[in-house]
Amino acid sequence: MPISRRAQRIEPFYVMEVAKAASVLAQQVAHTDSPMIFLNIGEPDFTAPPLVQAAAQRAIQDGQTQYTQATGLPELRERISGWYLQRFGLHIDPQRIVLTAGASAALQLACLALIDAGDEVLMPDPSYPCNRHFVSAAEGTSVLLPTTAEQRFQLSAAQVQAAWGPRTRGVLLASPSNPTGTSIHPDEMRHIAQTVHERGGVTLIDEIYLGLSHDAAFGQSALGLVGDGGEPLGEHILSINSFSKYFHMTGWRLGWLVAPTALVPAIERLAQNLFICPSTISQHAALACFEPDSLAEYERRRTEFKARRDYFIPELNRLGLTVPVMPDGAFYAWADCRGACQRWGLDADDPAHGSWDFAFELMHRAHIAATPGRDFGL
């Protein structure tokens, strides 16, 4: 059967290819003294707190399982708005909040609403691989701009200004980032947003790990940015968020985006046609995420992630898997495996394939599943 050129352009999500191989091997070694240790998939090992689970069960028992509005339950949009006020001191109109089937759906909707054929979107290298495919699916082109450890693997306003061209539509950023766990400094973020706004472009920012910030200097939403002249830049920014990471609901497939008011009707039309609505059960469950007991539990878990980071990164460095920048958020480590590749006789000069081969060697030698950098760039 002929496959569309659009589908052919989409590369495999190699993270999941590694996960499949690890799952097969895990079954073979499950009852040995060296079972598989999974460090590869970007999800918490915590599950939804008890109140959230109970809310889901109650929704099913009460028959609250039919379609909602395409933009989501009004009550949940209100709760999210209240969370922005409580946590960040931001007044976000609930009408700007659109519930989606995970952050991936939010990114897809944003790209389809904003990108025309031939438009270019600037993004850092390394970055989350699916982002460039969301752009491609909207018939746009991703322009990857190399970053360095000195930049915390994030774009600078100077890079954005230098790379901006006649077909540039905007930038797609993530702070904290997958795969580096690093954030954009607020001053730099303001300069980037100002640069983009002055050129009539749009700033999309993935903030799904913002709740897992470990450094107060970086833990603020870009929605609160103010320009040099006092204009509220945040009103022109699209922020993508999710119940997956901080709220520990990965398989529930529920996220949201905060969009400029004028863009919401277009996003709603797309959502009506593509998704009908997000999972109704997940939405009712998510209402309980904002109860005081749930929020307290999330903060305890965030502290646990920081403690793990403080132990894990020095140990990786000691093993020769150098992490050039200490992550300030999320739960990732962007480690340099070239030295380990050399020790194991692997190709250290080709970062993409070297990391791929290293991941499989690690899987088979030590029964540890880790994600190679092949997907992410650089």
Predicted regions and their residues:
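Conserved N-terminal alpha-helix of the aminotransferase class I/II PLP-enzyme fold
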Residues: 67-101
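PLP-dependent class I/II
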Residues: 3, 7-11, 16-18, 28-59, ...
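C-terminal edge-of-domain segments
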Residues: 64
